[in-house]
């Protein structure tokens, strides 16, 4: 049976996450416009810096920082940010971002995840219209970026992944 295009792109994002270097959670993101992949991104340290998988430890884990908090202490650039950095804004206007995350300890997909507050801001400013997030092999959610604009969670202190 032929895979629908949403799962096709989510499958590609899931493959992209395999390049990730985080010891806690790896994410893969792809940006698609007019059924063409504009760019890809995965979780990893900035170019030229050591990755956590090379160092053998995660600073946030050592400090027992819970998921969704204190990202300024993380070595990695998030998958969404890396995908956005790699694409010109003119090609992202009206595009769709596909996002998949995997917990590196369990090997399971990260259910009910969402982009962190900083990545949401980048997605908004990039001009991306929709975000598809895979929850498990059979289910995904579609988020209208306009919802993130209208419901400014930075006013409510709600966290992302």
Q: Where do the model's predicted regions map?
A:
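Short, basic/aromatic recognition patches
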Residues: 1-26
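Short beta-strand scaffold segments in enzyme catalytic cores
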Residues: 26-40, 132
């Amino acid at each position: 049976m032929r895979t629908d295009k949403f799962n096709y792109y989510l499958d590609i994002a899931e493959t992209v996450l395999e390049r990730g270097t985080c010891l806690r959670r790896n994410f893969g993101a792809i940006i698609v416009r007019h059924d063409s992949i504009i760019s890809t991104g995965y979780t990893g340290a900035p170019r030229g810096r050591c990755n956590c998988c090379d160092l053998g430890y995660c600073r946030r884990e050592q400090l027992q920082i819970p998921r969704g908090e204190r990202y300024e202490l993380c070595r990695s650039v998030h998958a969404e940010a890396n995908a956005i950095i790699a694409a010109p804004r003119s090609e992202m206007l009206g595009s769709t971002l596909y996002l998949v995350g995997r917990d590196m300890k369990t090997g399971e997909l990260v259910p009910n995840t969402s982009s962190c507050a900083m990545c949401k801001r980048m997605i908004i400013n990039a001009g991306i219209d929709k975000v598809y997030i895979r929850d498990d092999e059979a289910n995904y959610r579609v988020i209208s970026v306009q919802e993130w604009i209208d419901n400014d969670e930075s006013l409510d202190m709600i966290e992302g992944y």
